[in-house]
Amino acid sequence: MSVTSWFLVSSSGTRHRLPREMIFVGREDCELMLQSRSVDKQHAVINYDSDKDEHRVKDLGSLNGTFVNDVRIPDQKYITLKLSDNIRFGYDINTYVLEQIQHQVPEEALKHEKYTSHLQMCLKTAAAGREDQFKEHGAHVDSAQAKQDKADKKATSDIPAYRTPLYGQPSWWGEDDDNKLDKEGRRQDEHYSERPNDMTQHEEEINGNMSYRDSQDQCVYPFRREPSYFEIPTKDFQQPVKPPETQVYEIPTKDTDAVPPVTPPVMQSHASFTIEFDDCQPGKIKIKDHVTKFSMRQRKTAGKEPAPTEMVSAESKVADWLVQNDPSLIRRPAPGEDVYSTKSDLPIHNRTLKGNRHEDGTQSDSEDPLVAQPEQEIGTPDHPQLQRQIKREPEELLHNQQAFVIQFFDDDDAPRKKRSQSFTHNANSPQNDTDPVLKAKAEKRKGTLHVEKVSTNGMGSTAPASKSLSSPSFPQRSNSFRREKTEDRISSAPTTAKLPGKNYGSVGKKSKLAQEFAAEYMREQVEVVKQAAEKPMTLPLSTSILQQPASQVQISSQAQTMQLTSDVRTGKVKNEEEDNLSDAGTYTIETETQDREVEQARKMIDQVFGVFESDEYSKIASTVYRPVIKLGEEEPLASEPSVPHKPIMSSTPPVKLSNGLPAETLIERTGSSSKQSQKWVSRWASLADSYPDASPTSPLDSQKQGLIADDEDVIERTEHQGEADPTVPSRTRRLLPQLPPENVMPTIFVCQESFSDESQRKSLEEPEKRISEENSSLLLVQEELDPDSLSDTSKSDDGVISVRKSAKASNTYRNGWKGEESHSREPSVQRTSVPSNEKKSTCFYVGNDDVGSVKQTSFGLSSKDVIKGPESHIKMKVNLHITAETPSSGKAVNQFPKKDNGSAKDPLSFVRQESFTKETSSSNVLPNKLPHISTHPLLKDLSVTKSNHDYSKETRLILKETETALAALEAKLFTQSHLDEIENTPCLRDDSLSGDSDVDTASTVSLVSDKNVPSHSQKNRIVSLQKEKSSSTSSIQEQYCQPSARERLSEKRRTVPADAGTRNVTKRLGMTRSTGARGSLDFTDEERCSSLPYMPVSETVSSDYEHSSSRHISRRKPFGQTCKDESSRSSNAQKVQQALTRSNSLSTPRPTRASKLRRARLGESSDNESADVERSNISPGTSSANSSSAKSSTETKKPSRLDILAMPRKRAGSFNVPSDSETTSSVRGMFSGRSIDQSYTSRKPAVAESKQPPKKPLPPTQKQTPRPRSSSVKYSSSSTSRRRQQGSDYVSTSEEECGSNHSTPKHKHSRASTATQTSRSSSVSRRQMPNSRQDEEEDEQEVYNNFMAQSVEIAEIARLSQTLVKDVASLAREIHDVAGDGDSQSSSGTGQSTSISSVPNTPASTISAREEIIKRSLQRTCSSQLVHHIPEASLNYQKIPPGSTGLEDFDQNMNDSREDPSKRRARNIEEVIFDNLMLNPVSHLSHTICANTEVLTEKMKILFQNTEKNWEEIEAKINSENEVPILKTSNKEISSILKELRRVQKQLEVINAIIDRSGHLDVPSSNKKTSSTILTSNPLSRTTNNSAARTESQTPGHVRNYMHKSSSSSSRSPGSSFSRDDEETYIV
């Protein structure tokens, strides 16, 4: 065609056609791009004035200007261009002349929207038609010209309206097909009128598609089109689109398009990727334009057009691309198929995760069920029918498949077509199904998107209804269409009314048109589709659908649902498909009923945040969710959790139901509970819980089975045993949904309000006796509570209940619970998980709904239930801690009854159930699970302790004492069975934020104390009783928090049984341990109950230091009084404190755990724990304080003063520290909230302050202040160790300390030595360090004041510690000889007394310490004994200096000032002793050897002066070869010795080389033997710490050799061999 156009002809002859629109001229991203750097990025614009038919140029304020006829034009002003005007932009070498040229343009190019707009050609007719059609479609272009211009502009405005190309493709993209179909002009007319058609035409033309096929003259131009956006094989793609088929079907499409232009535009615009979507028929897509075009019209066009085969390959490529980039395809994978996104580590849960569309495996509460429902319904009701329709009724197929004409294109290339369909999202079902690869891809993507949307739909009937509305209009945007389809089917199958209720912005537009055209097209293509795509599509559809839900059971149910839904939907789908047509070609999901979509999106968001309330999610999601998805009945489940779930459960999770519990019953139970708790349980959280829970299913199941055959239990068991999916949800440990305490809190509060603490205690005492007998019922109740499976607290509480029952019947409980523990390594967690799993409804923590209703109603233990109500309230606050702490709290509660009745174990378990967050923290919920974010362990502790506040003072004291004793025993047992305990009761409980790491490190003792409580519930409870009796005087809250931590520790160290009979001893020992191993735990306790630690610390101090029941009794009385005041005070301030404790403890436990972990890794935390464990080991069953019992009288010498001193030192939060009633009450009252803050804000300062106290003795009142500080310091293991030290020191029995606490002082000193090299001998320096630290902490006035109060105590403690240091030094040597590594451990931190238990106490830290000690000792040049000991201390010390951040920093971070002085002092003492013993003789020997060697060297030089051997050369050579860096050591003497020995070594090597350069001379065998003996014995002696004796026993020469060799070895790399040098030295 001849067309006249305006051109800019450059001086180089290049012609640039000026379109009838504004174009930019510049260097970047401009229509006219110039290369000159003098041209701005956007230099000028050339606009077209259609009225005057002239072009105007405007300079955009460019730097170098625009010149017209060599005259610079003003900026920002249009200048009219005339023919032959000379234009220059900037200083570009090219000048442009405006010319009007007549040129030939192929029709195809004319059809090209952009090209035609640029050219004035006979497209006006088409333009007019387009204009009309555009108007019909509400196009933004008013005139054909404007439309063309807009098209030229890539129809950016049209794109959104018409579903224009998704990726910036011009609006004409894909219009080739339309033009091709009705190329005569209708297509062109419609092209602009109906953007989709136009796009199709343009696409075809541009891509060489059907238009060219349609008009064979244009067939020549397929590639003639103006190179534009996508000159990709769109033509090819379109051409292979089964031209006959396409043409045939596209004719109706075009007709349909012509009838309802609005619908076609969407379709075509949808074909952003050269994919033509039939505007009329959503199910029709022409892949030729990248399969983007849906269009049945394309099909029709294809029918008209010659069927190009090339198109198929292009389509395939495009289809692949679409599959990869098509959200519908992503949507394709049903929840069942979501295997790709195992949202978690457990592949077992893949099916469970099927509903989870998040790759991390998480899923909103609504998400999972929604996905399941939409998937099921889509796949089950509609998709199967759609498949059938696709195979049988093109209309239905299109309707159901969202205009996936690609399937129909399957005639040419069914899989490819299906890919195109997958692109459409409608094709997802048939197309993806047919194409496994595409299907997988699509399903993955769809799984993500669709799950999100479907999840939202599943959230409520309304959401699915809205989605289903969009779903009938499958042609809607591919993403939304697919989702809509799924949702539609979901809603249509379960709620047929929803289908008609679908609201799509485009429903009115495309529904009818899409349906009608789809019917026509489908009928036309029925044969083709049936032949090529029917079987594959039907199969794939059903398969994919089935796969999504877990095609097993749901296939049949899907078929049924399909039939029902498809029947209902068929009519609706047609109507909706008309709407779908508007969405058919677009990914935009907006076309769906936006209102509903918005609602669904909001629902999804709510679900993500756990707000969504979906029984299906909570229960079915966890237990039957996947099956529900498969059945496609999830939506009904949403509406009728019990009814829909039952069928689904029965069909889908028959395995789960294998227990005999009807699926119906299971569903009902889960449904009811899930409704209550699921609101806050995110779907993803439930899923997360469920899949991790699958692993621990068997233990839980066994426990459940053993305990009860309850339906819920059966469900839980079945879910766990039968299917991971069901199990996963039930045990879901995802606590994020727990965050909202709204659901749980009310119930918890109800329980709390319903029952008073006193009544709880009493009822606990009574029911506790029954609990062991009623374990089954308890578990049943717990299982009932489990519906809040998400609520770990609920599970924990349940677990705790069982634990407490077992605590009464400890063997029974431990057997059941430990069995669970063995299964999941988290007995407490697992137990809690069992109820949680049983209650698949991860609604929230059972304590909320079930405790209030189920518990009270179901439990025979009404009193226990009552008790649990208040405790649960506390737990709710302490939610995170509840799981782990509940056992502790339970212990505390039980301990009270133990004292009274000898058994009290269940109240706290209820409390645990009560936590607002359902703490699914059970063994089932492994560390893999999300931590209980909602339920903070500290909060739990606070709640528990607060609930226990009402207990009698005596009970508190007893609990505290018992806890102290148990703490010591637990410390010992913990070290012994730390690994086993970790396995049995992994510290990974979600309650503790860092449970995983806790398990691995010695610091886990404190952290795991909460978690391990279940295992050691009895023991811990006993200790807790003792400890809490002391601490209860100060503050029940704190006591319970403290006992909770201790109980956790004891449970963690559950191997150590605590006998109430050993309470007195345990008091001392527990206190010692609270100062000792409990030190680290103290931090946790304090962290958990910030205010509590203070009192407990004082009690611990009193116990440790007093070690006398009399002191305890006296303190108990004051504490009892204090407790009364404190209890009332805490009852009022309890909430505030709990809140503070929550916020503070939330952060506190983590730092504590972190510091503990660090210390454990550095060997410090473990050392502290080891020290505590040592004490425990020393006096585990008996008065486990060997020295404590022996020296209890001594310790009681200065009960008040020592206690005061000890309290500040134990401020780190030793469990029994709060021994002074006044200090406890005032401190706890004062610092309950503040101390936590202090501990958080100034752990270091607090620690420093703790150390500082030795400076200034202060009255007990001041002591109270230090005590809070000690709570802050509680974090530091050093403070803990110091507490221990203080305990013994305050006892004024350094010998006692050595005996029972000796390890602790030793540890402290060792740690201090490791941390600092300051001479330990100077207690003044230590006091100065506390003073300086005190100054540092002066910033914190309270802490400082407290520290001042402590400083006096610390000063005395320092004096006592000096004695202890001496004892420690001697003991260290003894220990080194006996248990060499143990001392090094103690030196490394807590374990100077590791000789007995330090090594076993902290396995990890001990091992590392030992290893390091051994290495260091080997490297050390001191005599072996001293070397071993010093390396041990210096090992840790060097460990600290080189890695000071590691050990010292952690230690000091926790007890900064304090550890430094004690460490330095201890280290200085030991080093002084050892150095004096070893370094002096060694130094002397080294000097002598060096001098002798120098003389020998000079003589040798003279002797060999005239020889041919060059002494200097050899010496230089050897020196260079032997250049080994000298080990850095804090001891200058050692360094000098090493240097001297190295020099001697080199000189000897030189002499040896000179004398026997060739090496022919052989040293006498005797010498060799001697030398080797020396060499061998030296390392051995170093290793065994007997090197000193051996060295002494050996000849001076040997000693010299040894020293020389030792220095060489130490200076050289460990592997370096000095045998030659040694021999030489020996010879010399």
From Swiss-Prot:
Keywords: Cytoplasm, Cytoskeleton, Microtubule. It is found in: Cytoplasm, Cytoskeleton. SUPFAM superfamilies: SMAD/FHA domain. Residues 23-73 form the FHA domain. Residues 147-156, 180-201, 436-453, 481-490, 758-773, 817-828, 1045-1056 have a biased composition (Basic and acidic residues). Residues 1176-1193, 1261-1280, 1312-1328, 1381-1398, 1606-1618 have a biased composition (Low complexity). The keyword Lipid metabolism does not apply. It comes from the Eukaryota. Residues 136-201, 329-369, 415-504, 566-586, 637-659, 719-739, 758-842, 1005-1084, 1100-1341, 1379-1405, 1443-1463, 1560-1628 are annotated as: Disordered. Residues 421-434, 454-479, 1005-1023, 1129-1150, 1216-1227, 1564-1596 have a biased composition (Polar residues). GO terms for cellular component: cytoplasm; microtubule. InterPro entries: Cent_Immune-Sig_Mod (IPR051176), CEP170_C (IPR029300), FHA_dom (IPR000253), SMAD_FHA_dom_sf (IPR008984). Belongs to the CEP170 family. Plays a role in microtubule organization. This is Centrosomal protein of 170 kDa protein B. It comes from Xenopus tropicalis. The gene is cep170b.
